[in-house]
Swiss-Prot record:
Residues 95-386, 781-1056 form the ABC transmembrane type-1 domain. The gene is fer6. Induction: Expression regulated by iron through the urbs1 transcription factor. InterPro entries: AAA+_ATPase (IPR003593), ABC1_TM_dom (IPR011527), ABC1_TM_sf (IPR036640), ABC_transporter-like_ATP-bd (IPR003439), ABC_transporter-like_CS (IPR017871), ABC_transporter_C-like (IPR050173), P-loop_NTPase (IPR027417). It comes from Mycosarcoma maydis. This is Multidrug resistance protein fer6. The chain crosses the membrane at residues 94-114, 138-158, 220-242, 247-269, 331-351, 359-379, 769-789, 817-837, 890-909, 915-933, 999-1019, 1028-1048. It is a multi-pass membrane protein.
């Protein structure tokens, strides 16, 4: 627990309770374990609950007001309920901070009154220097000096603790908001996530950007009103000091106020405009990184780089103007008091007043002190406006519709699943099966209200009647887009039920079509928050065929599989998915086409042993499948079309009815209805007709005559279950040490730890950042601007002193004019510094963004396999935002303060040389304290950045797996984990902010000692220095003392923020790169001869391995593929099929051997030339949000006619090119996503086409059409097909069977099938494929 909870008042005052952390960080690099635990009332779970309760209360108050005042509710509340709720949970803590800030500001602004008294003391003493006995008592001067010191010291403590509460409020609200957003996000309805626009990327933006803006506003909120109080008091005191002469200066303040307000508004407008492009750029980067495999395999790196660069250019065009305007605003804020001072003093002199030193220099102090509130007032209001808009955006999450479980769960129900006239709707932005383009009218995407929303379009699933008794296996079949997966989603509670009744007998587990895998260990993915049972766990591994896979992994089940399971094959991910559902031990298991990603043999084992076997015996199972050969083992079969159940019944009943299922079986069945003995004497061709007849006649022999009707509820005969194929687990893998005992389980991370630098930021980092801009031009200009600004700043009070003394005997007008010139040049110098550094910031940030993006786009796949997507996108969002908005300004301010510190020391030392003694001592203390602080602060910032990324990764990953998490009932567990990660990050964040307060209280207290030393010196030298010189020294140190502290703080803060530069530079300079993208001489020659001309491929002695592994995944492989040949690759998961494809695309480089295409070694050419010459249809379809046209042709290179043709050839004619596709293709079925991926490849005209499990998620009827298209359209095109579904490759010219990276068989399908003990024949037997089942070659 943090020592703050038990610290005494002195320790709390000085923040001494954090000393142990600072000592630890000073002596060694800090680690996460060094961080203190948060106090319970600061934990996110507590805060999130408080916020949600306060929000509910405020909304109820608003609702009561609306009901009581129906005529006053036309306009929305000026302050939204969320902001009131945030105020409620921090009210006491926050507003006590406001009171402290007010007292500190009042004390600061009245300090010049003591300065005036000291100057009067010095004047009286100086005037009586000849008669020192009559001079004022030294004690009174010392008393005034001590009084000034005490006021300043008190203001230091008040100010630091006010800021501490402001920063603390920001942290509290940020943690509460992230937790509340996550909790709400995990319960949002599908409608809210699609139509409401609250998808994963939007919610991530809310926690990373909007919650941070509210955090930032907490730090500056009180300045918005205390600054106004300061200004009012200061103006009143100026009128008291200068009488009516102060009015011209005050008029300047009044006149400049609307100008600064207008600039602030313009800054806000520019911020909003730039954020539009920032969001677009971040979204583009996110989509490119998320779909990097497609980008690289299609050689789209350069077009996407150009696209992102153009978005960046538009973003920076607004950002450039914004930075220039901000520089102007700061210059005006600095210049306004100076101009006001000049006008007031000139007026004061013109009306005949004597230039009294006490009046002049105390008034000068008032005007100078005005700079702080004038500078921070627009910043504070800008932060508040930003926060208000952020709160408005966040509140939409709490306004949005939540998932309402209308499903009845009755553990005593006889039936496992019962649907009675049930209708469901997705209510997405665009129906997946409609050809109508989206109507993009204004307001269409507005978030839904939490109240139930009327249905405004046809439901996706209509009037479903289905009864599945407990313990039965029900298969769902139908074409692509028929509603099969939607039915699974409906039963999982993801679709909105609009009619009818749904009853389930217990808990559910879901196997989604696309397996959601966490970036954690294999064990954690399977156990998924349940209690660990070693025996059951091992049994699950065995029946799901995972033990052989664990045998190949060095860490067994403790292997971390990476983000989205990147280290696993598609089959392994799906088996992990099935294992998770099996281990969960739910009453009902919903399986959405989970066999399609498995090879034939493994799929047959999984089906026999798990789905239809003992493993899931007694459970109610709903299996969506395209594998019609498994239907005989199912108790009940349902056929769907256009969201309706068109047929249902037992296998025999459906065959007898001669409906749609019988038609499918007639064409594609893999076995007879009755088990027949094989007759070797018959020629396979002669059996085809007999098979067709037996299918249609089998039903007549059955005694079951019941018919399935879509309007009549039909009950499955629970006793009809055929368990003949449930043979149990055979040939169990010998138990090896693949499953680590819980006490010894240690995972080896596949994901690389986030790059964390230790020690101080290197000189190389600063130089690299500086050299990213044209420094040779900007540096001289900046030095000139600094000299002009600082020279004018120093000379301004000196000239005022000379004017007061009449030093040169000049006319009053000359003194006035020169004094005014110094004021103007100060402003111009500051403006020039701001503009030059803004230009530097833009140039440097743009250059580093471009370099980092280029390195990422050309990084090898291994980089993306071991680096979470969230971490990569974080570099281009949060870290790049730091470069855009913070680093340049921090560097400019640091340089400015260093120059001001030097000028202050020189000026005061000229007046009182002994000042060099205390300032030297205090500067040593400054730098010692800073050195003691900076190592800890730097490490805390780095730890905070790492933990922040970790929290964001979990947030994003969880929302991507929302359907699975909700189906398994694990929402609470993930919410608790999110709390844990927020708290872990806040432990570092809170300590980092507290360390800054520790530094501030010490530096500012030393600044008060500087004031004391100058005051004592001028009191001690009262007979030797004039009142004017006393005034200059005191007024200058009063404002300059804070600059000493700011110099150290800015140096530390700059170093802390430079960690973002370190990370971006790591991406810009040190990411491993692929082989050359272009080899101009070779590539140009190949392009000139239109290579490849024929499509002939040769693999000669090919060896390949992943990473540092010693095992070859391809071992001395030799293969010749003739031009135009159709060759298929099959084999068990992990046999090397997909690896073969990766070597052809060179996403995995060979360790030995060569691959040639048309006689050219592919290693000799650039990657762009190679990959752009091939077409790949990948296993996992990558779909982007946007239009269908954009997904087919993201680079806009083809005519619509070409795109329509591709849609027609892939049976997607029901879709419009202008239809909107939601995030990750959420409004498309998995089959439709695969078909779009296929159509995308068809748009490219290449001589070689690769299909990597491209049709696994497509029903067999559509698959037949696609295969026909591939045969006809790709005639003469070399085609390589990787498939688990054996029947899809029977028409291939040759089949190559791989095992452990070696070709074990190769030949035509017919030749290999004839080998009764061959590997291919075994795969066919596992899939129940017989000769008459396909078009054999």
């Amino acid at each position: 627990m943090t020592p703050e909870a038990s610290a005494n008042w002195f320790s709390l005052c000085w923040f001494a309770w954090i000393d142990p952390i600072l000592t630890a960080g000073y002596t060694r690099p800090m680690e996460k374990d060094d961080l203190y635990l948060l106090q319970p009332h600061r934990c996110s779970e507590h805060l999130g609950s408080q916020l949600l309760a306060a929000l509910e209360k405020r909304r109820k108050q608003r609702q009561d007001y609306v009901e009581a005042n129906p005529n006053k509710t036309d306009k929305p509340a000026k302050i939204p309920p969320l902001m009131w709720a945030m105020n409620d949970i921090v009210f006491r803590y926050f507003w006590i901070g406001g009171l402290l800030k007010l007292l500190a500001d009042v004390g600061t602004i009245t300090s010049p009154l003591l300065v005036r008294a000291l100057i009067n003391f010095g004047r009286d003493s100086y005037n009586l220097r000849g008669d020192r006995d009559q001079a004022p008592n030294l004690g009174s001067g010392v008393g005034l000096a001590i009084g000034l010191f005490l006021v300043q010291a008190l203001c230091v403590f008040l100010n630091v603790h006010a800021f501490n509460r402001g920063f603390g409020t920001g942290i509290i609200l940020r943690g509460a908001l992230i937790q509340a957003i996550f909790q709400r996000g995990m319960n949002l309805s599908t409608r809210a996530r699609t139509v409401g626009g609250l998808g994963v990327s939007k919610l991530v933006t809310l926690i990373s950007a909007d919650a941070t803006r509210i955090d930032y506003a907490g730090q500056f909120f009180h300045m918005a009103w205390t600054s106004a109080v300061q200004i009012i008091i200061c103006v009143a005191l100026l009128i008291w000091s200068l009488s009516y002469s102060a009015l011209p200066g005050i008029a300047v303040l009044v006149l400049m106020s609307p100008i600064q307000t207008a600039i602030t508004k313009r800054l806000f407008a520019l911020r909003k405009k730039s954020m539009v492009w920032t969001d677009k750029r971040n979204k583009a980067v996110n989509e490119v990184v998320g779909g990097i495999r497609v980008v690289k395999q299609f050689a789209w790196e350069e077009p996407y780089s150009v696209r992102i660069a153009e978005l960046r250019r538009k973003e920076m065009s607004f950002h450039r103007v914004r930075l220039y305007l901000r520089s102007l605003n700061l210059a005006l804020a600095f210049a306004t008091p100076t101009i006001a001072t000049v006008l007031s003093f000139v007026t004061y002199a013109l009306v005949g007043n004597e230039l009294d030193a006490a009046i002049l220099f105390s008034s000068l102090s008032f005007f100078t002190l005005l700079r702080t509130p004038l500078q921070f007032l627009p910043i504070a209001w800008n932060a508040i406006v930003d926060a208000k808009n952020a709160a408005d955006r966040i509140e939409k999450v709490f306004d949005a519709e939540i998932q309402r479980d209308q499903i009845i769960r009755d553990c005593s129900a006889t039936n496992g699943i019962q649907l009675e006239d049930a209708s469901f709707t997705w209510e997405t932005a665009q129906a997946a099966d409609t050809a109508k383009p989206v109507n993009e009218k204004k307001g269409q995407d507005s978030p839904s209200n939490e109240k139930e929303t009327p249905v405004d379009r046809a439901s996706t699933l209509d009037s479903l009647n289905l009864t599945v008794p407990r313990g039965t296996l029900c298969a769902i079949v139908g074409g692509v887009g028929s509603g099969k997966s939607s039915l699974i989603s409906a039963l999982a509670g993801e679709m909105r039920q609009i009619a009818g009744k749904v009853t389930l007998s217990g808990s559910t587990a879901v196997c989604a079509q696309t397996a959601w895998i966490q970036s954690t260990t294999i064990r954690n993915n399977i156990v998924f928050g349940n209690a660990f049972d070693p025996e059951r766990y091992r049994y699950v591994l065995e029946v799901c065929c995972l033990l052989p896979d664990l045998d190949t992994l060095a860490d067994g089940d403790q292997t971390i599989v990476g983000e989205k399971g990147v280290s696993l094959s598609g089959g392994q991910k799906q088996r992990l998915n099935i294992a998770r559902a099996l281990y969960h031990n739910s009453e009902i298991v919903l399986l959405d086409d989970c066999l399609s990603a498995l090879d034939a043999r493994v799929g047959a084992d999984i089906f026999a042993n798990v789905i239809a076997g003992d493993a899931m015996a007694g459970k109610t199972r709903l299996l969506v499948t395209h594998s019609l050969n498994v239907l005989r083992s199912c108790d009940w079969i349902v056929h769907m079309e256009e969201g309706r159940i068109t047929e249902q019944g037992t296998y025999a009943e459906l065959v007898e009815s001669k409906g749609r299922v019988a038609e499918l079986l007639l064409t594609h069945t893999k076995d007879h209805f009755e088990e027949e003995k094989k007759e070797p004497s018959k020629h396979p061709i002669d059996e085809i007709q007999e098979t067709a007849e037996s299918i249609l006649d089998a039903g007549s022999a059955s005694n079951r005559n019941s018919e399935a009707s879509e309007s009549t509820t039909t009950t499955v005969n629970a006793e009809s279950k055929d368990t003949s194929n449930a043979e149990g687990v055979t040939n169990k893998t010998e138990k090896k040490d693949l499953v680590a005992p819980p006490a010894q389980a240690k995972s080896k991370a596949l994901m690389q730890d986030e790059e964390r630098f230790s020690g101080s930021v290197s000189r190389t980092t600063y130089l690299s950042y500086l050299n990213a801009a044209p420094l040779s031009i900007l540096l001289p200009l900046f030095l000139v601007a600094v000299l002009v600004f600082q020279g004018s700043t120093i000379m301004s009070p000196v000239w005022l002193l000379w004017w007061q003394n009449g030093h040169f005997g000049l006319q009053q007008g000359v003194y006035m004019g020169i004094y005014a010139v110094f004021g103007i040049t100060q402003s111009l110098g500051l403006l020039s510094m701001g503009v030059i550094f803004s230009t530097f910031t833009i140039k440097s940030a743009t250059t580093l963004h471009h370099r980092a993006l280029q390195r990422v786009l050309h990084a090898p796949f291994s980089f993306f396999d071991t680096t979470p997507q969230g971490r990569i996108t974080h570099r281009f969002s949060k870290d790049m935002d730091t470069l855009d908005n913070i680093i340049g300004e921090a560097m400019r301010t640091l340089i400015g303060t260093i120059v001001q510190v030097i000028g202050s020391i020189v000026l005061i030392a000229i007046l009182t040389p002994y000042f060099l003694i205390p300032v030297a001592v205090i500067l040593v203390l400054y730098f010692w304290i800073a050195a003691y602080y900076r190592s800890t602060a730097r490490e805390l910032r780095r730890i905070d950045a790492g933990l922040r990324s970790n929290m964001h990764e979990h947030f994003s990953e969880s929302l991507h797996g929302l359907v699975t998490i909700r189906a398994f009932g694990n929402v609470d567990a993930f919410i608790a984990e999110n709390c844990r990660r927020i708290d872990k990050q806040n432990r570092a964040y809170w300590l980092a902010q507290t360390c800054q307060r520790w530094l501030s209280v010490r530096l500012d207290f030393l600044g008060s000692l500087l004031i004391l030393s100058v005051a004592i010196l001028v009191v001690a030298s009262r007979f030797d220095i004039s009142p004017g010189e006393t005034g200059v020294a005191l007024s200058y140190i009063l404002t300059a003392q804070s600059i000493f502290g700011w110099m150290i703080r800015h140096a530390a803060e700059l170093e802390n923020n430079m960690s973002a530069v370190e990370r971006v530079l790591h991406y810009a300079n040190h990411i491993e790169q692929e082989k050359p993208y272009h080899i101009p001489q070779v590539d140009d020659a190949l392009e000139a001869r239109e290579w490849p001309e024929r499509g002939e491929i040769r693999f000669e002695g090919v060896e390949a391995k992943y990473g540092s592994s010693e095992r070859n995944v391809l071992d001395k492989l030799d293969l010749h593929i003739a031009p135009g040949e159709k060759i298929a690759f099959c084999g068990r998961t992990g046999a090397g099929k997909s690896t073969l494809v990766t070597t052809l695309l060179r996403t995995l480089e060979l360790s030995a051997g060569t691959i040639t295409i048309d006689g050219i070694d592919i290693a000799s050419m650039g990657l762009h030339r190679l990959r752009s010459s091939l077409s790949l249809i990948p296993q996992d379809a990558v779909i982007y949000s946007g239009t269908l046209r954009y997904n087919l042709d993201p680079l806009d290179q083809h005519e619509d006619a070409t795109l329509h043709d591709a849609l027609q050839r892939t049976s997607l004619t029901d879709l419009s090119l202008d239809m909107t596709i939601t995030e990750e293709g959420g409004n498309l079925s998995a089959g439709q996503r695969s078909l779009i991926s296929l159509a995308r490849a068809m748009v490219r005209k290449t001589r070689i086409v690769i299909l990597d499990e491209a049709t696994a998620s497509i029903d067999q009827e559509t698959d037949v059409q696609i295969q026909e298209v591939l045969r006809n359209e790709f005639d003469g095109i070399t085609t390589l097909t990787v498939a688990h579904r054996i029947q899809t490759i029977l028409h291939s010219d040759r089949v190559c069977v791989l095992d452990k990276g070696v070709i074990v068989e190769i030949g035509s399908p017919a030749e290999l099938w004839a080998k009764e003990k061959g590997a291919f024949r075994a795969l066919c037997d596992s899939a129940n494929i017989r000769y008459q089942d396909g078009e054999w070659k």
